[in-house]
Amino acid sequence: MKQIIILFGLIFLVGCNSNEKNPVIPKKLDAYFENSSNVNLDKEIRLKYIDSAKNIIQEASENDSIKIKNYFKLANRYFILLEYDKYKETTTKILDISESINDSLNIAKAEYYLGD
């Protein structure tokens, strides 16, 4: 019985190893996106929240679908605030990442966003 418990304990400890060096904090990112959508705040304050979210997204180490999804959220916030230069810059970044990982769905979506 002791051997089984020790075996499960070892499997549990080995299975809990995380390879992420800089994990993105989703709650903080969601809070920034939520505050950037608050119409009761001034445009400058909302832009600061968006820029903070952008910094967190850029720190994510891997170019994956979650990073692209967050960049699309970022682009939408810039579009709502009529920051078209930052919108275009963010959408171009999405397109570059999508092309680098051969993600045809997000390439098409980024091209559509650039057409707006």
Task: Please tell me what each predicted stretch does.
Residues 4-13:
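Sec-dependent N-terminal signal peptides
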Residues 16-116:
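A "functional boundary" signal
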